[in-house]
Amino acid sequence: MCGIAGYVGRFEPSLLGQMNRAQGHRGPDGSGQWHDAEAGLAHVRLAILDLSPAGAQPMADATGRVILSFNGEIYNYRELRADLERQGVVFRGGSDTEVL
């Protein structure tokens, strides 16, 4: 099971690292962080579907404006992905998170 933590407020440089250390036991396959001036996300990963770096989180969309951290499994993600690809969406990896 992955670990997800976040905050809203003024950026504190050490806060995301503290969050990931506290939840590190939940995600042995990697960790990631994202922040801007007003919010931050910390994610530790238990990789199930896409074991490559392309499945790392927090994940950004192609514009970089939408940031996502997700724990779960979308059982029909292959069908959803195929529908999106027919509409012209280009994927960078093979994770179900990217389909969101």
Q: Which residues make up each language-model segment?
A:
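N-terminus-centric sequence/structural signature that marks the extreme N-terminus
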Residues: 1-100
